[in-house]
Amino acid sequence: MEMFQGLLLWLLLGVAGVWASRGPLRPLCQPINATLAAEKEACPVCITFTTSICAGYCPSMKRVLPVILPPMPQRVCTYHELRFASVRLPGCPPGVDPMVSFPVALSCHCGPCRLSSTDCGGPRTQPLACDHPPLPDILFL
């Protein structure tokens, strides 16, 4: 009877593994279009623009016995290849640089979170917003 239960468990886990490997229920890490906002304190407007960012699921694991072993590094969806684009904020006073640069994702991968280039926080409940009045969307892809 124990052998039968072990065989049944092995078959169930095997089938579950095949089913799970067919594809994740969430989209994998990839470039997606997103609308972002740009403003500067001295400039009277906010510009929203559409660009590509990295977003999606990265497989992760958590140790069952974290007290005994050190924590496993968690990978995040981050830039693999990128280029930079810029927008000009209209109406900035003299002496204030009106240009705002931002990354455009060309490709993404799951890797360690580097605070120098990645927002490592979780999903946001509200989009980033501006304090100044917005101008119409600009498209950068």
Swiss-Prot record:
Subcellular location: Secreted
Any GO molecular function: hormone activity
Record keywords: Disulfide bond, Glycoprotein, Hormone, Secreted, Signal
UniProt-annotated glycosylation sites, renumbered to this chain: N33
One Pfam family it belongs to: Cys_knot
Signal peptide range in chain numbering: 1-20
InterPro entries on file: Cystine-knot_cytokine (IPR029034), Glyco_hormone_CN (IPR006208), Gonadotropin_bsu (IPR001545), Gonadotropin_bsu_CS (IPR018245)
GO biological process, any: G protein-coupled receptor signaling pathway
Keyword field contains Ion transport: no
Disulphide-bonded residues: C29-C77, C43-C92, C46-C130, C54-C108, C58-C110, C113-C120
Broad class of where this protein is predominantly found: secreted
One cellular component term from this protein's GO annotations in UniProt: extracellular space
Summary of the function given for this chain in its UniProt record: Promotes spermatogenesis and ovulation by stimulating the testes and ovaries to synthesize steroids.
Family of this protein: Belongs to the glycoprotein hormones subunit beta family.
Quaternary assembly: Heterodimer of a common alpha chain and a unique beta chain which confers biological specificity to thyrotropin, lutropin, follitropin and gonadotropin.
Protein's name according to its UniProt entry: Lutropin subunit beta
Source taxonomy: Eukaryota, Metazoa, Chordata, Craniata, Vertebrata
